[in-house]
Amino acid sequence: MTSVRKRKMARSSVKKNTRRTKDKQRNINIHSNPIIEANWDKSLTLKQNYKRLGLRAKLGRSAGGDERKVESLSELQAKREKNQKNQSKHVPTVSEIENLDDPSRIPEGEARLIRDPETNEVIKVIYGTMKVDDKDESEEEIENPSVIKQLEEYAEKNSKIKKERHQSERENDWIKSLYEKYGDDYDKMKWDKKLNIYQQSAGDLKRRIIKWKKANGI
């Protein structure tokens, strides 16, 4: 015999969010671009997929929610040696930090401990405030760089193709009713509040009717 709680749950209009439902929500069908669709990994999130393909999910900077990586001194020094020509700020060595009192010259995430010469206890901590240039997202390694090239070629090819907009069945019926009532008098069409409810201009109505005539052989 089922419990009262289970009977209430069975009658409830709120459906239980099962794993099967979650999987359906996760499986996004990508139809907008055939190249992205071919390289899409359904086991990853949208942001992870974009990052893997070398794309950005958001054009702006992150507003929060991302944990910033604090680089160690050894990592900063390795980065300085690798990018010595392009480095805009000098990253001090360990021996240099030991003699620094200015927080603005110590890298953020590092600190200098000042100890008592007699007891060797820490009497002061100077936290670094120097901002070290973060590695830009565009400099990160892309798993499949050929995708970017394919997307650029696809965009260039399709930008030259002019796609003609076809009039819908509803639009055809609307234009037909206007033409049957007014013929080629577009100024009168313009002032018809019942048929021209969106107040299309005479020029716009003329273009639509010329296109409709061409499609219907009139």
Curated annotation (Swiss-Prot):
<keyword id="KW-0687">Ribonucleoprotein</keyword>
<feature type="region of interest" description="Disordered">
    <location>
        <begin position="58"/>
        <end position="92"/>
    </location>
</feature>
<dbReference type="GO" id="GO:0042273">
    <property type="term" value="P:ribosomal large subunit biogenesis"/>
</dbReference>
<comment type="function">
    <text>Involved in the biogenesis of the 60S ribosomal subunit.</text>
</comment>
<feature type="compositionally biased region" description="Basic residues">
    <location>
        <begin position="1"/>
        <end position="23"/>
    </location>
</feature>
<dbReference type="GO" id="GO:0030687">
    <property type="term" value="C:preribosome, large subunit precursor"/>
</dbReference>
<comment type="similarity">
    <text>Belongs to the NOP16 family.</text>
</comment>
<keyword id="KW-0539">Nucleus</keyword>
<keyword id="KW-0690">Ribosome biogenesis</keyword>
<comment type="subunit">
    <text>Component of the pre-66S ribosomal particle.</text>
</comment>
<feature type="region of interest" description="Disordered">
    <location>
        <begin position="1"/>
        <end position="29"/>
    </location>
</feature>
<feature type="compositionally biased region" description="Basic and acidic residues">
    <location>
        <begin position="64"/>
        <end position="84"/>
    </location>
</feature>
<dbReference type="Pfam" id="PF09420">
    <property type="entry name" value="Nop16"/>
</dbReference>
<dbReference type="GO" id="GO:0006364">
    <property type="term" value="P:rRNA processing"/>
</dbReference>
<keyword id="KW-0698">rRNA processing</keyword>
<protein>
    <recommendedName>
        <fullName>Nucleolar protein 16</fullName>
    </recommendedName>
</protein>
<dbReference type="InterPro" id="IPR019002">
    <property type="entry name" value="Ribosome_biogenesis_Nop16"/>
</dbReference>
<dbReference type="GO" id="GO:0005730">
    <property type="term" value="C:nucleolus"/>
</dbReference>
